[in-house]
Amino acid sequence: MLKLFGWAMMTAVAVGGTLSLARAEAMNAAAPVCRAGGSPAILVEVIGVRSDAGTVRVQAYGGDPARYFDKGTYIERIEMPTAQAREICVPLPKPGTYAISVRHDANGNGKADMKDGGGMSGNPQFSVWDLIVKNKPDPKQVQVHVGQGVTPVRVVMNYVQGGSFRPVATR
């Protein structure tokens, strides 16, 4: 399996360095939903992950926008090794309006700490203060309208760097 994964990675780089849905399918059990294209889903492209260590968690939120990102209110959650998490298919129950959060647990300890990265659909800007007091973005900034099919969403990861929370160089 590792040889197959290595071969797939080398092929992706040789063909242009982009990740494809085929690679996402190999890493994400929900990817066939995105490949088929007939069911509501979000294909999350994770940009700017600082390292391949740890895990990446993608959560989808629906329903009341005031409850987006509240603990335990997600409707779908996918977690996978960071090295395999660049395109992640998130199946959804029906067309509608959703929000996405992505967390990079850089040290894989399962706890939020200053080494972790994060991002949301719409890529709202956050300050370190926002993180400390747990401010949430305006729902209109993060909403994704999903129809009967696959909706692509690009999420740029941010990390605490000095006194700010911002993207690192894109990988």
Where do the PLM segments sit?
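Extracellular beta-sheet/turn segments enriched in Thr/Pro/Gly and aliphatic residues
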Residues: 25-33, 124-163
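Acidic, glycine-anchored loop motifs typical of Ca2+
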Residues: 105-114
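Bacterial N-terminal signal peptides
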Residues: 8-18
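A short tyrosine-centered beta-strand micro-motif
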Residues: 96-102
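Beta-strand signatures of extracellular beta-sandwich domains
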Residues: 57-61, 101
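A short, amphipathic beta-strand motif
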Residues: 42-48, 58
